[in-house]
Amino acid sequence: FTYVTSPLNVPTIIEKNQGIFEKTFGDMGIEVDYAELTSGADQTQALASGDVQVLYAVGGTSVILSAANGADIKVLNMYSRSPKAFCMYSKDESLTTPESLRGKTIAGPTGTNLHELLVSYLATAGMTIDDVNYVNMSIPDAKAGLDGGSVDVALVAGATAYNAGQQGYHLVADGEGL
């Protein structure tokens, strides 16, 4: 099983802390071990390589991309959808439309719900990822790039998104309605 600690994954945290899977699967003679993997790309790679057998709290985008690349993945269940938890933040308050992002440097993790958010947002204006300078990096690195001024927009989620809002950064868009 994968274990994702992000606050977006409260069911995962409760399940692990209460030992629900250990008890349920243990009753069937199946041992449960956890691998702490925090990105969907890492989770699907671990599944494809056989390092883990179950992904828990993985983003749909990562699963779709992995399956499209030939991974044998079966979706058994979903427990949430939180479009407002996936955000694009900037220091520049003039970035209010997809068109205003043209040529801007936007950083975030490729192959994730955040990447899908950006692509979907740009598509509302007939734009593609090629219309921006997209840089693949982790959520913490994207936020650090925004803090330091090396990126114009950071794709963030969970506590990092909350903190960006608390710092007064401008919410360009979230996943609501996309």
Regions found by a protein language model. Name each.
Residues 1-17, 111-113:
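Extracytoplasmic "Venus flytrap"
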Residues 4, 57-58, 76-78, 108, ...:
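Short beta-strand and adjacent tight-turn residues that come in two discontinuous sequence segments
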Residues 9, 18, 44, 48, ...:
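Extracytoplasmic/secreted envelope proteins and their assembly/folding machinery
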Residues 22-36, 51, 123-136, 145, ...:
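A local structural motif
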Residues 48-58, 70-73, 104-105, 147-156, ...:
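Alpha-to-beta junction loops
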Residues 61, 134-135, 140-178:
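Pocket-lining segment of extracytoplasmic ligand-binding domains
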Residues 79-90, 170-178:
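Periplasmic-binding protein-like
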Residues 90-105:
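Flexible hinge/capping segments at coil-to-helix
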